[in-house]
Amino acid sequence: MTLILAIIPVLLLIVLMAFFKMSGDKSSIISLIVTMLIALFGFAFSVDNLFYSFLYGALKAVSPILIIILMAIFSYNVLLKTEKMEIIKQQFASISTDKSIQVLLLTWGFGGLLEAMAGFGTAVAIPAAILISLGFKPIFSATVSLIANSVATAFGAIGTPVLVLAKETNLDVLQLSTNVVLQLSVLMFLIPLVLLFLTNPKLKALPKNIFLALLVGGVSLVGQYLAARYMGAESPAIIGSILSIIVIVLYGKLTASKEEKARKSTLKTKDILNAWSIYLLILFLIILTSPLFPSLRSTLENNWVTRISLPVNATTVNYTISWLTHAGVLLFLGTFISGLIQGAKVKELFIVLWNTVKQLKKTFITVICLVGLSTIMDTSGMIAVIATALATATGSLYPLFAPVIGCLGTFITGSDTSSNILFGKLQASVAGQIHVSPDWLSAANTVGATGGKIISPQSIAIATSAGNQQGKEGEILKAAIPYALAYVVITGIIVYIFS
C-alpha cells in the first residue's frame, strides 16, 4: 500500500501535464497538495516536518535554481535590449546557413559548455532562447535543448554530480568518472544524431547527419574518456564540449557552399567580441571561481555566506549559500557589466531585470512547488520506498534497471546531483548484495539521472520560460518522453551487459 501511495505524486504530475495538458504551475500546485496529504496520512509525517521540509525545498528552489534561471534569461534579454543578439545571429549564419549545424553547435556544443561550467538550467535556457531568436519554433527549440542537455549533465557544474557521488559512496572519483563516460559512450553518438535528425529528417540528409554525429561523438568520447581517466570529474564535460565546438565549426566552414565561402562577413572583430562579451565574461568568472582554482575558490566560498538550519525528522538540515561563487551572482555580474559595455544605462538594465522577473512568475511557482514536492517525498520516505521496491523486485536483473532509479531521482528533483545524494548509497549497497562492482552500479545512477534530465518538469519549466511558452509544458513533456525512455533503455542494456 505504501508503494502505491509513494508513486501517486509522480504519476499525478505526469498525467496532469502530459495528458490533461495542464500548465506547469497548476500541475505542480495540485501535485504538491496531494503529496502533502499522502505524507501526513499515508506516511505519518508530522505537520512540523511537513512545514520545514517544504520550506527547505522552497529555499533550494530559490537558490541556486531560480536565481540562475532568472539571470540566464536576464542575460538573453539584455542582448535583445542592446540589439547585440542580431550580431550573434549573423555570426551563427556566417559559420553555416545549415540549420542542423546551427542546432548542434548551440545545443550540444555551446549548451554542453554552459552545463559543464554552470549547470542548473543555463544549458537549457540560453541555447533555447538563442534558437528562437534565429527563427526556430519555440517548442522545437525547447525540445532539442532538453535532449541535448543530457550527456553533459553527468559532469555539469565542474563535475559536481560525480564528486558528490564519490563522497556519498566513498568510492574512487577517477574510477567513477571513467565508468560514467563508458556507460554514456553510445549516447555520445546517438544524441547528436537525434538532434541532427530532428532538425533535418529528410532521407538525403541521413548520410551527412550520421557522419557529423560520428565525428562529434568521437571527439566527445575521446576527450571525455581521457579527462575522466587521468584528471577526474571536473573537466570531462568542458573538454568534450570545447572539442565538439571546434569540430562543428570546422565542419561548417569546410562543407559550406561556394556562395557561402565567397560571401565575406561584414562583422568586425570588435563588434563580435562586444556582442559575445556577456557570455565570455560569464565563462571567465565561472572558470575563475571554479574548483580549477582551489585556493581562490576556498577564499571566496568562506566569505559572504548565508547559513540557515532547519529541523527535519529529528535532525538538522543545513542550507548554505556562498554568494561569491554562486553561479547566479556570476551570471548577474557578467550580464550587468557587459550590458554597460554594450551601451545600456544602469536604469535600463534594472528595468530589463524587473521585466524578466515578471516574465518568469509562473516558472517561479512551478519550480518552488516541484522542489518542495521532491523534498517532502524524500524526507517522508516515499522515494526510498519506490527505490527499494524496484531493487527487490528485479533481483539479479537489477543492473538493467539501475539507470531507471537515477532517472527517477532526476525526474523528481530536477538535479543529477540530488539524484546521486538520494540513491548513490542504495546503488552501491545493492551492488554488494548481487556481487556487481559498486563503482559500475553507482556510475549507472548518474548515467540514468542524465536521461531523467530530458523529462524533468523543472527542466521543462526552464525551457518554456526561455521561449515565453508557459502553459506548454505538457506538450514538451509528451514530445520528450520517447527520447528519455530510449535513453534509459540503452544505458540499462549497457550497464547490464558489462556488469
Report the location of each language-model feature:
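Hydrophobic alpha-helical transmembrane segments of multi-pass integral membrane proteins
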Residues: 98-129, 133, 364-377, 394-426
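Flexible interhelical linker loops that connect adjacent transmembrane helices
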Residues: 202-214, 255-274
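Membrane-core helix-loop-helix motifs of multi-pass transport proteins
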Residues: 146-251, 461-494
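Structural signal for alpha-helical transmembrane segments and their membrane-water exit/capping regions
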Residues: 2-3, 13-49, 71-82, 248-257, ...
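Membrane-interfacial loop-to-helix junctions in multi-pass transporters
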Residues: 3, 60-65, 92-106, 134-140, ...
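Transmembrane helical segments that form the transport core of multi-pass membrane transport proteins
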Residues: 240, 259-406
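Alpha-helical transmembrane segments of multi-pass membrane proteins
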Residues: 100-112, 138-151, 172-188, 192, ...
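Short helix-coil transition sites and intra-membrane helix breaks within transmembrane domains
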Residues: 63-65, 76-83, 113-123, 151-159, ...
